[in-house]
């Protein structure tokens, strides 16, 4: 539904511009077709494009050239970042500690300069241990070694890892 709402606004703008004598020959509907990060079920490209084209035709704009940019839907789930666990920093439970002091940190050799989306957009990325361990999983914030408070890859992730292990993001 958000795509259709955005399309309606775009078509209103096109109509306003053309009412002033400026012809519009094509519509670029942008990109960002959804991909699955956790349990989301984005609409298929066929369903989304079908709904958009139906709305474009219904609003009398079917004669225009329509462009789409598939964005991350083409490659978003195609890559994996592998990183080594450099250090495990257990949290403390002392009264009066600053915020976050009770957290456990898994410090890895990948950083926000390797994968910017979590730091910049709070994007959720799956993180799994590459070694199978019988250890009880611990909840960690997975962070990089850059001296910057925003250098994190995942918050509150349950992992059974040790120093020297590898994770896949």
Sequence positions of predicted segments:
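Charged (often Lys/Glu-rich) extended helix/loop segments that serve as interaction or gating elements
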Residues: 51, 62-169
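Active-site loop/helix belt of alpha/beta enzymes
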Residues: 1-89, 153, 158-159
């Amino acid at each position: 539904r958000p795509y259709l709402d955005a399309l309606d606004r775009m078509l209103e703008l096109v109509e306003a511009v053309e009412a002033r004598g400026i012809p519009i020959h094509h519509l670029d509907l942008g990109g960002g077709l959804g991909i699955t990060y956790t349990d989301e079920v984005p609409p298929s490209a066929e369903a989304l494009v079908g709904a958009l084209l139906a709305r474009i035709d219904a609003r009398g704009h079917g004669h225009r050239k329509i462009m789409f940019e598939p964005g991350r839907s083409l490659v978003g789930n195609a890559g994996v970042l592998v990183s080594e666990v450099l250090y495990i920093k257990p949290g403390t439970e002392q009264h009066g500690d600053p915020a976050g002091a009770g957290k456990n940190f898994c410090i890895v050799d990948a950083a926000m300069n390797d994968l910017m989306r979590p730091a910049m957009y709070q994007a959720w990325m799956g993180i799994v241990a590459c070694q199978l361990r019988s250890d009880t999983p611990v909840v960690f914030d997975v962070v990089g070694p850059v001296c910057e408070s925003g250098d994190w890859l995942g918050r509150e992730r349950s992992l059974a890892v040790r120093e020297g292990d590898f994770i896949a993001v």
